[in-house]
Regions:
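Alpha-helical promoter-recognition and RNA polymerase-docking modules of transcription initiation factors
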Residues: 1-98
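Internal acidic/polar
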Residues: 100-110
Length: 110
């Protein structure tokens, strides 16, 4: 069953569809977490686990709003910027990686 079909079932009140959708999306969440961690140079297992947990919470939040419009694209396309943004914010706040990243690179703010 596709993500979009499970999402429609969840919106119609099928709580088991949400569980199946979450299980189906775990690989996608892990992929976004890996990309986010690598962007900031911190891809240890503990950080990846934390990012996956943050991603799961953001997934729940995004799905519960009911704002996803299937006609505008796939569910993963809709979710990706939300998950990535949540993970970036988590890294910046909890790991202060933005400062390390800026000072290790040649970038100097004006």
């Amino acid at each position: 069953m596709t993500n979009e079909e499970l999402y429609r079932q969840y919106l119609s009140g099928d709580t088991e569809a949400f569980e199946r959708l979450y299980l189906q999306m775990q690989g996608f969440i892990a992929s976004v977490a890996k990309d986010a961690a690598q962007s900031f140079g911190c891809s240890d297992k503990e950080t990846l686990d934390e990012l996956c947990a943050e991603g799961a919470l953001e997934l729940c939040k995004c799905l519960s709003t009911g704002e996803y419009d299937e006609e505008r694209g796939k569910l993963t396309t809709y979710l990706h910027p939300f998950l990535r943004g949540k993970m970036y914010r988590y890294l910046i706040i909890n790991h202060k990686v933005i400062f390390d990243y800026l000072f290790k690179s040649s970038y100097m703010p004006v």
